[in-house]
Amino acid sequence: FISAGQKQMNQLDSTASAEGNTEGLDFVDAESRVDLLENKVVLCVPEGSDKGIDSFDSLAEHLKAEDILFCMGNSDVPVGQYTQKILAYYDLDEAALAAAGVITYGSNVKEVTTQISEASVDAGVVYCTDAYSAGLTPVDEATKEMCGQVIYPAAVMKNALHAEAAKEFLAYLRTDKAATVFESVGFTAL
């Protein structure tokens, strides 16, 4: 299992804190758990946009002015959670912006990239890798201070039908050969 966030892995890992694993689930082979990749949270705008959004700072100004339509992931998906941290960093009230009709949501990062690509919104926050896949050019990259790091943990599940093969595959994903592929699409191998 590879997750785009520690929270989702922690929910399945009995060795995670009680705060992280609120239901006491025990699906992760803790000895196999590794931090595999890092992704970046980026700001993208539609090609040819004339709104002047070229940084997270300018995005925050436009959101405060309520003069754009911004897309972010729902709060139950990792990219949405990282975006919420960015909004908090700029002291922006997500609920108030949503009520004002300034925010639209995607149920996953693909929906956010689609809204940006189709110019249905003026800006959106996605992962660097998803921007790459969708042919979008990021205009800014969130700092660690804005939203923390986007670390992709990986682990073999205790109920894996082919646990040894899963462990071998996870070991392969940590090789230089795999790192080259990951880095070619925007990830940083850890």
Provide a role label for each language-model segment:
Residues 3-21, 25, 32-39, 45-190:
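Exported/periplasmic ABC-transporter solute-binding proteins
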